Amino acid sequence: MIKDIIKLSIPRKPDYISLVRLTASGIAHSMALNIDDIEDIKVSIGEACINVLSLNNTEEISLIFEIDEDKLCIKVKDVKENIPKELDQSKERELGILIIKSLMDEVEFNEEGIIMIKYVEDDSQ
């Protein structure tokens, strides 16, 4: 069961990616995630936002943070995994997707965008 949902929309400008990273960091910290996981989340969400910036013409980037007892689920709309070659001439987007997949516990792409999940580790074990 989802505990809290935070929705964030930012202008489609690179200047606001740091705000998204800071927001994600604050949310992750409030969930008692360790510093390594917080840094992984910050890098991943930054890469997801860069993907949106380079891809579409929407006026804003929409994010949803779903806070659960054992995980943080982050949804970023309009992130794409596979781009037609005529629209993408660089390897940077591919690298960004690989970074996200390596840092987050679960990553799923769908027609709306990307879903990234980081689980809270139980330190009592």
Which residue ranges define each predicted feature?
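Conserved beta-strand-loop-beta-strand hairpin that lines the nucleotide-binding pocket
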Residues: 1-6, 51-125
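Bergerat-fold GHKL ATPase/HATPase_c domain
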Residues: 1-43
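Residue-level detector of secondary-structure transition/capping positions
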Residues: 28, 46-49, 80
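Conserved ATP-binding N-box helix of the HATPase_c
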Residues: 35-60
